[in-house]
Amino acid sequence: MKYKETIAIVNDPDVTLGSLENNNIKSLNAWELKWEEMTNSYDYIILGGHMGAYDTDKHEYLLSENKWLSKSVDNGTKILGICLGSQLVADSLDGEAYLSDEIEFGFKNLNFVRNEEIFSDFQETEVFTWHRDTFKIPSKAKLIA
């Protein structure tokens, strides 16, 4: 299977690609982008941040990113949302990001609910979580883990 080049959208300067940085994935800062010039010729990873998708008063670029995400999904662009990124994808479609009543904190095993070949190397992966935001899954989205 041939994959397109992947671009990671960084939403917070403190939340980067980390160990994926050297895997031929280009990073772009969301707050510096001209969203109207973004193309659908890439696959995208939308990274997390300390804010919630609903914090648009403090982070106005999230509004432009949200509009771009909606158009990109409609155009068939492949998008992986991680943490805040998944909230933004949900908000751009018919889902909804919101503050949960519970805090999730600590190391957790990834729990895959779909068998996707692209994630086969991550089947036994432990990740660190620290968030209180969650979202309703949009009808166009696929829950993978």
Q: At which residue positions do the language-model features occur?
A:
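N-terminal beta1-alpha1 cap of cysteine-dependent amidohydrolase-like domains
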Residues: 1-75, 111
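Pocket-forming structural segment of enzyme catalytic cores
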Residues: 93-145
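Residue-level detector of flexible, active-site-proximal loop/helix-junction positions
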Residues: 13, 32-34, 86, 104, ...
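Cysteine-nucleophile active-site neighborhood
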Residues: 50-116
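Short, surface-exposed loop and linker segments with low hydrophobicity and enrichment for Pro/Ser/Thr
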Residues: 1, 82-84, 120-121
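Short loop/helix-cap segments at secondary-structure boundaries that form the rim of catalytic
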Residues: 18-22, 35-40, 89-90, 120, ...
